[in-house]
Amino acid sequence: MIRPVETDDLAEWKRLRLALWPDSTAEQEETEVERFLAGYPSPTLMAAFVCVRPTGGLCGLVEVSIHDRAAGCETDRIGYLEAWYVDPDYRGTGVGRELVERAEAWARAAGCLEMASDTNPAYPVSPAAHEALGYSGVERFFRKDLR
Protein backbone atom coordinates (compact mmCIF):
# COMPACT_ATOMS: atom_id res chain seq x y z
CA MET A 1 0.00 0.00 0.00
CA ILE A 2 1.36 3.42 -1.00
CA ARG A 3 0.51 6.36 1.25
CA PRO A 4 1.93 9.69 2.40
CA VAL A 5 4.60 9.41 5.07
CA GLU A 6 3.32 9.87 8.64
CA THR A 7 4.91 10.88 11.93
CA ASP A 8 4.79 7.27 13.14
CA ASP A 9 7.03 6.29 10.19
CA LEU A 10 10.06 8.21 11.52
CA ALA A 11 12.26 5.22 12.40
CA GLU A 12 11.47 3.23 9.25
CA TRP A 13 11.71 6.29 7.01
CA LYS A 14 15.12 7.04 8.49
CA ARG A 15 16.17 3.40 7.92
CA LEU A 16 15.19 3.61 4.24
CA ARG A 17 17.02 6.91 3.77
CA LEU A 18 20.16 5.46 5.38
CA ALA A 19 19.96 2.47 3.04
CA LEU A 20 19.75 4.87 0.09
CA TRP A 21 22.49 7.19 1.35
CA PRO A 22 24.88 4.99 3.39
CA ASP A 23 27.42 7.82 3.71
CA SER A 24 24.90 9.83 5.71
CA THR A 25 24.52 9.50 9.48
CA ALA A 26 21.50 8.59 11.56
CA GLU A 27 21.62 12.07 13.08
CA GLN A 28 21.60 13.76 9.66
CA GLU A 29 18.68 11.68 8.48
CA GLU A 30 16.74 12.25 11.68
CA THR A 31 17.20 16.00 11.26
CA GLU A 32 16.02 15.81 7.64
CA VAL A 33 12.88 13.79 8.35
CA GLU A 34 11.97 15.88 11.38
CA ARG A 35 12.31 19.08 9.32
CA PHE A 36 10.12 17.58 6.62
CA LEU A 37 7.46 16.48 9.11
CA ALA A 38 7.51 19.99 10.60
CA GLY A 39 6.56 21.37 7.18
CA TYR A 40 9.93 22.41 5.77
CA PRO A 41 10.36 23.58 3.11
CA SER A 42 6.62 23.55 2.41
CA PRO A 43 3.93 20.90 1.98
CA THR A 44 3.11 22.50 -1.37
CA LEU A 45 6.71 22.16 -2.58
CA MET A 46 7.65 18.70 -1.32
CA ALA A 47 5.97 15.38 -0.55
CA ALA A 48 7.05 11.93 0.58
CA PHE A 49 5.28 8.64 0.06
CA VAL A 50 6.04 5.22 1.46
CA CYS A 51 5.06 1.64 0.73
CA VAL A 52 3.84 -0.36 3.72
CA ARG A 53 4.75 -4.05 3.97
CA PRO A 54 1.77 -6.37 4.48
CA THR A 55 3.48 -7.59 7.67
CA GLY A 56 4.14 -4.05 8.93
CA GLY A 57 7.00 -1.66 8.50
CA LEU A 58 7.99 0.07 5.29
CA CYS A 59 9.63 -1.35 2.17
CA GLY A 60 10.05 1.72 -0.01
CA LEU A 61 10.00 5.49 -0.23
CA VAL A 62 9.84 8.26 -2.77
CA GLU A 63 10.41 11.94 -2.05
CA VAL A 64 9.33 14.48 -4.65
CA SER A 65 9.68 18.24 -4.85
CA ILE A 66 9.00 21.04 -7.29
CA HIS A 67 11.94 22.69 -9.05
CA ASP A 68 11.87 25.72 -11.32
CA ARG A 69 14.49 24.18 -13.63
CA ALA A 70 16.11 20.85 -14.34
CA ALA A 71 18.46 19.53 -17.00
CA GLY A 72 16.65 18.92 -20.26
CA CYS A 73 13.31 20.28 -19.07
CA GLU A 74 11.41 23.00 -20.89
CA THR A 75 9.02 24.31 -18.24
CA ASP A 76 9.57 26.18 -14.99
CA ARG A 77 7.52 23.93 -12.71
CA ILE A 78 9.04 20.47 -12.66
CA GLY A 79 8.35 17.52 -10.41
CA TYR A 80 11.70 16.22 -9.17
CA LEU A 81 12.42 12.80 -7.69
CA GLU A 82 14.65 13.68 -4.75
CA ALA A 83 14.82 10.16 -3.32
CA TRP A 84 13.59 6.77 -4.52
CA TYR A 85 14.41 3.56 -2.70
CA VAL A 86 12.93 0.07 -2.43
CA ASP A 87 14.26 -2.59 -0.08
CA PRO A 88 16.07 -5.31 -2.07
CA ASP A 89 13.51 -8.01 -1.19
CA TYR A 90 10.74 -5.89 -2.78
CA ARG A 91 12.57 -4.90 -5.97
CA GLY A 92 11.02 -6.25 -9.13
CA THR A 93 7.56 -6.47 -7.54
CA GLY A 94 6.17 -3.19 -8.87
CA VAL A 95 6.65 -1.25 -5.63
CA GLY A 96 9.16 1.13 -7.22
CA ARG A 97 6.81 1.83 -10.12
CA GLU A 98 3.88 2.46 -7.78
CA LEU A 99 5.93 4.87 -5.68
CA VAL A 100 7.08 6.87 -8.69
CA GLU A 101 3.58 6.92 -10.17
CA ARG A 102 2.30 8.33 -6.87
CA ALA A 103 5.01 11.01 -6.94
CA GLU A 104 4.13 11.84 -10.55
CA ALA A 105 0.43 12.13 -9.67
CA TRP A 106 1.31 14.54 -6.85
CA ALA A 107 3.46 16.62 -9.22
CA ARG A 108 0.75 16.63 -11.89
CA ALA A 109 -1.82 17.81 -9.32
CA ALA A 110 0.63 20.58 -8.36
CA GLY A 111 0.67 21.83 -11.95
CA CYS A 112 3.85 20.17 -13.19
CA LEU A 113 4.07 19.09 -16.82
CA GLU A 114 7.46 17.39 -16.55
CA MET A 115 9.36 15.17 -14.14
CA ALA A 116 13.11 14.99 -13.62
CA SER A 117 15.51 12.97 -11.53
CA ASP A 118 19.21 12.39 -11.15
CA THR A 119 21.47 9.55 -10.21
CA ASN A 120 25.16 8.76 -9.96
CA PRO A 121 27.51 5.80 -10.43
CA ALA A 122 26.94 4.67 -6.83
CA TYR A 123 23.52 3.42 -7.97
CA PRO A 124 24.21 1.23 -11.03
CA VAL A 125 20.63 -0.11 -11.25
CA SER A 126 19.11 3.37 -11.20
CA PRO A 127 19.42 4.28 -14.91
CA ALA A 128 17.60 1.12 -16.03
CA ALA A 129 14.92 1.61 -13.37
CA HIS A 130 14.33 5.18 -14.54
CA GLU A 131 14.21 4.13 -18.20
CA ALA A 132 11.70 1.36 -17.41
CA LEU A 133 9.36 4.09 -16.15
CA GLY A 134 9.72 6.26 -19.24
CA TYR A 135 12.52 8.59 -18.11
CA SER A 136 15.29 9.36 -20.56
CA GLY A 137 18.80 10.61 -19.97
CA VAL A 138 19.15 14.17 -21.21
CA GLU A 139 22.59 15.47 -20.26
CA ARG A 140 25.84 14.44 -18.71
CA PHE A 141 27.30 16.63 -15.98
CA PHE A 142 30.90 17.16 -14.96
CA ARG A 143 32.47 18.79 -11.92
CA LYS A 144 35.92 19.73 -10.74
CA ASP A 145 37.08 20.30 -7.18
CA LEU A 146 39.00 23.57 -6.94
CA ARG A 147 40.27 23.12 -3.40
Positions of predicted regions on the chain:
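Conserved acetyl-CoA-binding loop-helix of GNAT-fold acetyltransferases
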Residues: 82-86, 92-105, 128, 132
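Conserved GNAT acetyl-CoA-binding A-motif
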Residues: 107-119
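Conserved acetyl-CoA binding element of GNAT-fold acetyltransferases
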Residues: 74-88, 140-143
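Conserved GNAT-fold acetyl-CoA-binding loop/helix
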Residues: 14-38
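Conserved beta-strand in the GNAT
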Residues: 50, 57-66, 80, 85
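A short helix-loop-beta-strand connector motif used in the catalytic cores of GNAT acetyltransferases and
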Residues: 38-50, 80
